[in-house]
């Protein structure tokens, strides 16, 4: 019996057991001045094409270095986010598309500044023109609202409207006008439990939601500035493009000490429907996406 006690005691002393549950949490997201953050993102996406034409696979990786400083407006924090790495591989029917990742590679070394309010909600993106440069492909892929979406996906898309405890849930709803359509997400977070992640005490938050896209509510400014984008939008409308089914599930780990989300695993599945432009026959395009995000923090020396 004594040897068994000696074996168990170190685990108790050094906290190898489960984390103690915390009540009345609001999960504020903080970007602390004097800390440098490194965020890594990996995305894998696959779309199935009809009629045995082969599918489309996309692999994307990004690494962003984030340095916060006190904002110019009271109660805000401005976080300069520099792209240290960005790459994408695109395959059609199993064959790699040459130059598929060139637009993303052009981001390396560039930066944007994200402005957050006191509770960590992103309110503004600065320096978008510098980030996009004169690349029309990047301009069609990204704007301020889509950048807000990417930043939000790595954190909480909606915070609780009241203090919550393990077992509680809350809903969220967000909209992001994109260059050629409007993207909307709605869903529910559940504060499932507390657990240790690599020795760090975290809240495990479970996500369950849906995604919608509307081609009638795109970014009008982008359409007028980019004739090719406007032409592509009209083509989508004429094809009756819509999302008929969608599901988003995921798990996030919120670090209590850091006051930020340090790990995100998210799965998205969509079923898109449209008409074949040559035959006018209805097409169904299932698409699956897996996104992983990690956040590391290091105090400035």
Could you tell me what each predicted segment is?
Residues 1-9:
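Bacterial N-terminal signal peptides that target proteins for export
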Residues 8-16:
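Bacterial N-terminal signal peptides
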Residues 17-21:
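Sec/Tat signal peptide C-region and signal peptidase I cleavage site
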Residues 22-301:
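Signature of exported/secreted
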